[in-house]
């Protein structure tokens, strides 16, 4: 049986690195795909390249899609403050980037079809950031239907399948799995701020640090990061 090929969307963060490592554990030949979309935290792309190398991905590509051209998100527009006080239930946080995952998944599916990849690996999570509309199971299910209809491979019955193993996991479980898999957590980048070091106060940093402490690895928290 030939080795399965998977395209992994790799942001440089903990979740996407863990999802890619899970695909590797299952024996997949993994190709990483990252995006320069005009994000303030461009540092994550350096992390993505380093993670791809350390995990031993077969290839790693970085595509430019400048979503910052029209702003609309705290991650692409410096005039919008990055929240530090938690996600308000029932509201979509300002760190949501309009259409980001729809664009990323579409490009990922294009690469998957061109390379004959059987699945597209996503590190999306609906638990910690349930306010994001494009990180939810119903969104992923609907997109799978679209992908099956919108591609030659899908119409022929062998289109890439969206695989989001972390979608219902807690952050603590993700950290524990990352530790088990040997994911280079210290290399990953989760901070939303555009500095050279994690800020430790944005929602992404706080959720990550809380999970690391609960998992018994406070040494990997942003406050101790180099």
From Swiss-Prot:
Q: What CDD domains does UniProt report for this protein, alphabetically? A: QueC-like
Please tell me where ATP binds in this chain: 10-20
**What are its cofactors?**
Zn(2+)
**GO molecular function annotation:** ATP binding; ligase activity, forming carbon-nitrogen bonds; zinc ion binding
- Listed EC numbers: 6.3.4.20
Keyword ATP-binding on entry: yes
The reaction(s) annotated as catalysed by this protein in its Swiss-Prot or TrEMBL entry are:
7-carboxy-7-deazaguanine + NH4(+) + ATP = 7-cyano-7-deazaguanine + ADP + phosphate + H2O + H(+)
Q: What class of enzyme is it?
A: ligase
For this protein, the record's InterPro entries field holds: QueC (IPR018317), Rossmann-like_a/b/a_fold (IPR014729)
Report residues binding Zn(2+).
191, 199, 202, 205
Q: In which pathway does it act?
A: Purine metabolism; 7-cyano-7-deazaguanine biosynthesis
Under Pfam families, the record lists:
QueC (PF06508)
The record's comment on cofactor binding reads: Binds 1 zinc ion per subunit.
Q: Which family does it belong to?
A: Belongs to the QueC family.
- NCBIfam families in the record: 7-cyano-7-deazaguanine synthase QueC
Identification of the protein by name: 7-cyano-7-deazaguanine synthase
This chain's source organism reads Synechococcus sp. (strain CC9605)
The gene it comes from is queC
